[in-house]
């Protein structure tokens, strides 16, 4: 009877043994991290709609490594490094997630869908009522972006790479994805993965930052409203969204697809198109977010993430979000003194996304 090569029969185990201890340890770590993300998502500590598919994708991609026909290690999910058109078209007929990745993720379409959905949830009336407070606190919440840029450059990253990783400080996953695609495409996979991993963990960690930097007496402030807020009707909000979209696209054309998507969502919300609103705010937003989490998990292949620059990206991403959190809280303190005590500093942290 011919001897059976169990390394070939069970290639996930065989490639784990043959890939070397460092790569094997990285795969095991990512598999365990995937289980942790699923658990934290199930418990509601992290966002389940992103973290559960992301965790499962991390497990599958690092367990499902096999030997490809050319003798190299690979998988049947997707290959984000393909650039040759013929090779890409061939792979799209084999790797089941390659069409989704190529046609929605790598061109930023999925980020635009998410922004469109967010727009349907956005009430621009608050920005119209309190423009100074909104913009000031949002600016404070970008402290991590401003400070991380020169730090990253000093650590040896190029200006484009530094700007891409600094965008993590804005706590806006789709914007990080879009920016890294435009400025540092060779690093957009690790930067985007780092961004979403940290964003998920940050939402669990920011409450502790609040407790550390804001005393309980200030956290418990109940703000008094001296006069009733002005209510703006739908036509004013729609006109405001259209004008703001035009201004931002004019000033920053490189990000115009995201601005357009966001304000299109606002327009759908304010124009009373109920069926379109239900679709964009429901299936489109949640479906895109779910697929985004799944693709991010599948991109967490140990072979892809073992880049010498990854350690720098991990440190800089964490630093950017930490500094942005501190900046938001400092902005809250400044508003507390401007309002003579009638302002809860915790609000400063909540405006980091704006």
Predicted regions and their residues:
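Transmembrane helical segments that form the transport core of multi-pass membrane transport proteins
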Residues: 244-332
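Conserved small/polar residues in nucleotide/adenosyl-binding loops
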Residues: 352-354
């Amino acid at each position: 009877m011919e001897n059976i090569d169990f390394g070939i029969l069970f290639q996930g185990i065989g490639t784990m043994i043959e890939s070397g201890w460092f790569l094997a340890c990285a795969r095991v770590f990512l598999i365990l991290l995937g289980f942790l993300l699923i658990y934290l998502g199930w418990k509601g500590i992290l966002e389940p709609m992103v973290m559960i598919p992301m965790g499962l994708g991390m497990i599958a991609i690092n367990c499902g490594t096999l030997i490809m026909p050319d003798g190299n290690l690979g998988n049947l999910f997707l290959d984000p490094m393909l650039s040759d058109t013929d090779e890409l078209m061939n792979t799209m007929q084999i790797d089941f997630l390659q069409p989704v990745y190529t046609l929605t993720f790598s061109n930023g379409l999925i980020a635009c869908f998410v922004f469109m959905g967010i727009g349907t949830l956005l009430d621009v009336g608050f920005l119209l009522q309190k423009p100074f407070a909104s913009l000031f606190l949002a600016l404070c919440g970008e402290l991590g972006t401003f400070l991380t840029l020169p730090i990253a450059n000093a650590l040896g990253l190029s200006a484009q790479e530094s700007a891409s990783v600094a965008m993590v400080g804005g706590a806006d996953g789709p914007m990080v994805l879009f920016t890294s695609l435009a400025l540092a495409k060779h690093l957009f996979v690790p930067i985007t993965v780092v961004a979403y991993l940290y964003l998920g963990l940050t939402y669990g960690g920011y409450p502790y930052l609040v407790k550390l930097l804001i005393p309980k007496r200030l956290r418990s402030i109940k703000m008094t409203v001296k006069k009733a807020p002005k209510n703006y009707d739908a036509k004013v909000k729609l006109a405001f969204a259209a004008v703001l979209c035009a201004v931002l696209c004019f000033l920053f054309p490189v990000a115009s697809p995201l601005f357009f998507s966001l304000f299109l969502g606002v327009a759908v919300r304010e124009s009373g198109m109920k069926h379109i609103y239900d679709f964009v705010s429901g299936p489109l937003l949640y479906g895109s977010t779910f697929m985004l989490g799944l693709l991010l998990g599948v991109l967490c292949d140990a072979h892809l993430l073992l880049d010498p620059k990854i350690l720098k990206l991990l440190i800089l991403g964490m630093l950017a979000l930490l500094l942005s959190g501190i900046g938001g809280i400092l902005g809250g303190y400044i508003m507390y003194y401007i309002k003579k005590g009638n302002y809860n500093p915790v609000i400063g942290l909540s405006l980091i996304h704006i």
